[in-house]
Amino acid sequence: MDKYQNPLEERYASKEMLYNFSPNMKFKTWRKLWIILAECEKELGLDIITDEQIEELKKYADDVNYDVAKDYEKKLRHDVMAHVHAYGDQATNAKKIIHLGATSAYVGDNTDIIQIKEALIIIKKKLITLLYRLSKFADDYKALPTLGFTHFQAAQLTTVGKRATLWMHSVVMDIEELEFRLNSL
């Protein structure tokens, strides 16, 4: 009860989506991005980066020392630099190459894109599940008569199953839109 809680998150968000936008996911992604940065810099010829340093970064990638980072953030008043120092305290041989040549936007902006892409993948999976369930519903109610509607008034006779196939069509179009967005990220 000591911190702000959003009712949308508490009532409606899945555990998978909550984790995707959690601080834990964010900071682990920062570490993965720092590893990728070091690997690319080494590959491009920055010879001060060694394989041993990269392996040390990988060793601590999922072991985020939050209390240490919190202490650094109080001193530095900068979240990225706090995590650079905290990671460096764990991977002491790699300390000098963490975040080398990068700006805070490197980890911040790329993490945002990664989290957005993962969220869209979660949504796509849920839409595919919805499509499957709607197909079962449409089949179960293919013979149940109902009135169709057009221009907000009753029209000709149709079936509940037929109406469900129209809902499915909308979901298919949503999935196609998601796939387009995913491919453009």
Residue ranges and their predicted role:
Residues 1-185:
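A helix-coil-helix interface module used to build multimeric assemblies
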